[in-house]
Design a protein with these regions (language model features):
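Conserved GHKL (Bergerat-fold) ATPase module
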Residues: 1-289
């Protein structure tokens, strides 16, 4: 064990030396070194303690930061109303482009974390960093990822929500072991009309289960996605209006029949109220049912 500790110290000292003496070269080689350094941080507590001085984050712009540098960069703008520092990250810049842009539009920074051990490192850093959370940019709407204030209220009635859920669910693909849930957010008329998000917790558990046999339970669970409708957007409002108009057209003859039936019932009740019980015929009683 002493030999192992000595080797760990020598390796960490050498990496720190390179970082201090030639940081540009260290950054240039970081993508090649990252897997080795992250593995050491995850498996050796002493190596972690040394590595936090030179381990790097890389953002989507290709800039590198130490953990402390990045914390200082984002702390003023990416702290939520509960005092939690929120680290936004992406695992695929191309697939998650629109979500990254939504974060940038808010002035937020996004980390690129697409490595083999990044999901495990994230779990470790959340335990090490005080009042901090890592969330992927597509795991919720940007206002919910870093909640600065109470969300704008959705003004749809429960009946309108149910109708819109049916409209959109009817157009969704039927995929094996995949579930879609239609949800509603008031995101502003300039935000996207729809967004597809996936729970950070469940997605992370599924990713970790692929590498840890003991977590296979999560791997067997169906993928779950939220199809978020922005109720402030003109397109969503248009869909709602058209749905209500189409529904009204189909309901008109039914409502007319109901009103006619109610009028006949009222006339029968009035007529029967003037008769004694034994004067009401069997047919009249049947007409009231």
């Amino acid at each position: 064990k002493k030999i192992s500790n000595h080797i760990t110290k020598k390796v960490a000292d050498r990496l720190e030396e390179i970082f201090k003496n030639d940081r540009p070269q260290f950054e240039e080689k970081w993508d090649s070194l990252k897997l080795f350094i992250q593995y050491g941080m995850l498996t050796d507590e002493k190596f972690y303690d040394r590595a936090v001085k030179f381990a790097l984050f890389k953002d989507v712009e290709g800039k590198y930061f130490t953990f402390e540098e990045y914390k200082n960069l984002i702390k003023d703008n990416q702290t939520d109303k509960e005092g939690n520092l929120i680290y936004l990250y992406t695992t695929n810049k191309d697939e998650q482009y629109s979500y990254i842009q939504a974060a940038k539009d808010k002035g937020y920074s996004v980390l690129e974390m697409d490595g083999q051990l990044d999901v495990h490192l994230i779990g470790q850093l959340e335990q090490k960093f005080e009042k901090s959370r890592f969330v992927r940019v597509d795991s919720d709407t940007i206002d919910n990822l870093i909640r600065k204030e109470d969300s704008n209220k959705v003004t749809l009635s429960e009946e309108q929500k149910m109708a819109m859920q049916e409209v959109f669910k009817s157009q969704m693909p039927k995929l094996n072991k995949t579930e879609f849930y239609v949800t509603f957010e008031a995101l502003g008329e300039n935000a996207n009309p729809v967004m597809l998000t996936q729970s950070e917790y469940m997605r992370r558990m599924r990713e970790m289960s692929a590498m840890q046999p003991g977590m296979s339970f999560y791997g067997e669970m169906p993928d779950s996605f939220n199809f978020v409708l922005n109720t402030d957007h003109p397109l969503i409002k248009k869909v709602l209006t058209e749905e209500e108009q189409a529904c009204d057209e189909k309901l008109k003859p039914i409502l007319s029949d109901i009103k006619g039936w109610e009028a006949r019932q009222a006339d029968l009740r009035e007529a029967q109220s003037k008769k004694k019980e034994d004067e009401i015929t069997a047919q009249e009683k049947e007409d009231m049912t």
